[in-house]
Every structure is written in C-alpha cells, then in structure tokens.
Amino acid sequence: MANTVEADGSKDEGYEAADEGPEDEDGEKRSISAIRSYQDVMKICAAHLPTESEAPNHYQAVCRALFAETMELHTFLTKIKSAKENLKKIQEMEKGDESSTDLEDLKNADWARFWVQVMRDLRNGVKLKKVQQRQYNPLPIEYQLTPYEMLMDDIRCKRYTLRKVMVNGDVPPRLKKSAHEVILDFIRSRPPLNPVSARKLKPTPPRPRSLHERILEEIKAERKLRPVSPEEIRRSRLVRPLSMSHSFDLSDVTTPESPKNVGESSMVNGGLTSQTKENGLSAAQQGSAQRKRLLKAPTLAELDSSDSEEEKSLHKSTSSSSASPSLYEDPVLEAMCSRKKPPKFLPISSTPQPERRQPPQRRHSIEKETPTNVRQFLPPSRQSSRSLEEFCYPVECLALTVEEVMHIRQVLVKAELEKYQQYKDVYTALKKGKLCFCCRTRRFSFFTWSYTCQFCKRPVCSQCCKKMRLPSKPYSTLPIFSLGPSALQRGESCSRSEKPSTSHHRPLRSIARFSTKSRSVDKSDEELQFPKELMEDWSTMEVCVDCKKFISEIISSSRRSLVLANKRARLKRKTQSFYMSSAGPSEYCPSERTINEI
C-alpha cells in the first residue's frame, strides 16, 4: 500500500517527468518498487527538490512545523478536556443552589444557563481584571535576522573587541584623550585670570540727587541751634525766672540787646520794672559769691499760698483786660507788641537745661481774650515757661499720633460695618459704597457722586462731609493734639470772624463766673497749639462728621490728661530740694533729662 501511495505522490510532484520521456518513468517505477529502507525514502524525498543539497534543511523545517502543530493541537485538546471537567464541577456545585430548579426547567439549555450566570454575576458585582494582569504567553515566533540586523545587535550588546590603530608606531593623540580632557587642557593652557580681590574697578560716578530726595533731607534735618557759652547760660538763669529753661528763649541771652528786649516787653505789659532788674542783679552777685547753698524745699502751705497768689494775679489781669479794652484796639500798637514778643513754641528737639529755684516774682500784665484759633504771643512768664517745658517733655501721658488714631478709627468703622450683616441690602450697599456711611439715607447713583473720607476711607454724602486741615508730613511724627482746635474749627473761625466780636463788651460779672481751673485748661490748650508758621503746608482734606467728632473727643481727652500729668509733675518738682552751684565755665556740664527719666 505504501508503494501505491508513493507512486501517486510521484505522479503529482514529478512535474519534470513528462519532458524526460517514457524512459525516465520506467526508471522511477523501478526505484519505487525497490524501496527497502529509510535511505531509499530519503533519496525519493530529495529527488522532489530542485537541488538535492537543500534537502536536509528543508525537511528539518517541515518536521519542526509539524511538531509545533501537533503540540498546539495537544494543548488545545487538554484545554478542552479541563474545561469540560470544570463545567462538570460547576454543575455539581449549582445543584444545591436555589437556581437549580430554574436550570432544570430550562432543560439545561446552554444559552439560558450562561445568561443566568451572567445576570447573577452582574447583580453580585464583577471585578474586571486589567489587561496587564492577563497572562498571555503566545508561542515563540521563529525568525532569522539579516546580516545588518545581526551586526547592529552585536554593536548594541557590545559583543566586539576594537583594535588600536597605530600611526608611526604610536597611538594618535586624538584617540588618547576624550573631548572633555582636550577642552580642559585648552583652558589650562590659557593665561590665568586675575582674582576678584586683585581687580580694581573704577569708582562709580556720583548720582545727582533728585529734587524729592533733597526736599526729604531738608525735612528730616533738625533745626540748627546757635552755640551759647555756659557763662551766659548761668547769667541768664540768675536774671530771668529760674523755672524756665534757657533753650526755650535764646533770643534774650545770645544777642547783646537782651536787656533792652526785656525792658521793652516789660514796658508793654506793665509787668517788670527797674526794681526787678536790680533784684535780679543782686541775686546774681550773691550766687557768684557763694559757692554752694542748700535750698530748703517749700512746704505744702507755701505752695498753696503761691498758687492762690498766682490765681489772684490772673483775676486781676482778666479784670483789667475787660475794663480797659481800648489799649489793644490800636492796630499799630498790636503789631509792635507782637513784633517784640518772643514766640512761645519751640521744636521738641531743643534740650531743656537744669532748673534752679529763686523766690517767685509777681508779674501783672494786661491780657486780651482771643478765640482759640488765634495765636497769642505773651512775654515769658513763670507759668507759660512751665507749660512750654512740659509740652516738650509730656510726663506720664500717652500722646497718640495721627497715624495711630487713623488706624483706630478704621478698625472701629470695620466693626461698625459688621453690625449690619443681618440687613443684607444695607450691608451690601455700605460695603460696595452705594450708601452714605454716616447718615445711611443718601444713596449714590451715576449723577450723585460720593465723597471719600480721608480719615476712615469710607464714602459719605455732601451733607456729612466737612473740611479739615491735615498735615502733609508723615503722620507718625505728629501728636493728635496738633490737629486742633485750629484745624478742627477752621470753618467755624471764618463764620465767627464775620460776626461782631462781643468779647470786649462783656460785663465783669460774666468774667467772674469762669473758674480758675477752666481758665488754666483753656490757656494750656492754647499753648499746646501748633504755630501757624508750621501749619502753612497743611492741606485741606475732606473728613466725615463722625471722624471729626471722634478726633475732637480724642484731642480734648488727650489734652486734659496732658494738663493733669503736667500739673502732677510740677507739684512733684516743687517739693524737691536741689543745690545751686556757681561753677566755672570749664567745670560746667549741663544735665539733660530723657523721657525715661521723667
């Protein structure tokens, strides 16, 4: 039977036999009939190929392909067998379930059983595996690389050994060093750089100062004081009232016309006479003759008596001013008096000198009542000198600055805004600036604009907006009481000036009603005002009514506390005992008091 099969195969595959003729066919029939061993079979198979030398490789590949196919068939059959076994196990497990009756009703139909399983898994929840977790092991694919691919694979895997190329019996320099080493050698061959410490740069040309910087330097620079010798300081302290510091009035000491100025001021005010000058000179001679003399501290009774005498002198001065107002009505005389009177205000940077006590001298002067916004210049008296000294050194009193008061007001305004959160319409209108923050009745639209308060930064209407003079210098350097009352009552002073002044025609009984305490407070308020010369650069700004009231209350309270603190400090200084020394100019050393010592 094998012979017949081989004969049929030879007819199919022997396509060259027809050309050779009947002789070849007879030879093949003989060879087929004469198959005895495997060698004959191999010869017949090799005869099928065009070249017999390729027969081993060709039939090896055929055998490998057949073997791979049989292995695939074997694995496929084993998978089918294992799947059947798994299905049988699943059927046995599902017989005890509730769904076994449903499967029996469906008569074990495959599609129905699979559908029920899918629905059950969907109800219970199915966890799908990712594609990467799947174990997919395909069969190895056989391929043959081209010579180029084989060479590239060897280069990638570095399966090679390079031979060094010799030039004249030595390796060329290009192959000795890498590119990085060549660059480093080139850098090293260059001349060395100079170190940074040895370099000398040209000085930068001075930049010209701008106008803004020059103005700021002028503002920050302190007022230059004229130098005064210690001899003149001691002589002036013996002549003038000892409670007043020399730094508050330098014009009476440094100039040679100082006795003349003192005499003129005393003639205008009717206070000092030639007798006071003689007493002052005799006291100076006694002080120079005696080296040191211990002064006894005054008792409380003496202090009370001196205060009562000062109050009586104030009563007399006010009564004389109301009784004879025609003395100052002459404008020429007023101009002369104001020209001869020394200014009361001096900057805080001036340093007061140590005080020395002398028996109090009574002075009677004619005073004129003026509104609070008009600056009053008077000759230096004992009480005014004390207030000026205390203005430079406020004792036991916290003076708030304009910046601090502005911050406090803004915080209070924010807290006041939070009260209207329950009223959403009012709150949103106030927050967006569409409603007046003071009266809360005037709404702003496209035609009615709002004014912004420069103190609390809130929009207000025209009726709630007032004018106020605020300093253009940094707020942190100015105390709050420097804003008033000339800054607060600027509009009121204009309206008062239009009305006829009735202060000169007041009866004596109306003046007597004022207490001495109120007069002293008003006088100290006038003394604490900023002079008009320093308020010229202040600009008029828009401030709301609430902020203006808030500022006025703070100013009044701060001034009241400042007056009380100064009064306590003055009484404390009166009860202290100290030495009066007449040392030479070389031994003289003026003592300075700091804020912490006070």
From Swiss-Prot:
Stretches with biased composition (Basic and acidic residues): 354-370
Composition bias type Low complexity, residue spans: 316-327
Span of domain WH2: 147-165, 211-228
Gene Ontology MF annotations: actin binding
GO terms (BP aspect): actin cytoskeleton organization; actin nucleation; behavioral fear response; cleavage furrow formation; dendritic spine development; establishment of meiotic spindle localization; formin-nucleated actin cable assembly; Golgi vesicle transport
Domain remark in the UniProt entry: Binds to actin monomers via the WH2 domain. The Spir-box targets binding to intracellular membrane structures.
Record's function text: Acts as an actin nucleation factor, remains associated with the slow-growing pointed end of the new filament. Involved in intracellular vesicle transport along actin fibers, providing a novel link between actin cytoskeleton dynamics and intracellular transport. Required for asymmetric spindle positioning and asymmetric cell division during meiosis. Required for normal formation of the cleavage furrow and for polar body extrusion during female germ cell meiosis.
Name of the molecule in the record: Protein spire homolog 1
UniProt source species: Mus musculus (Mouse)
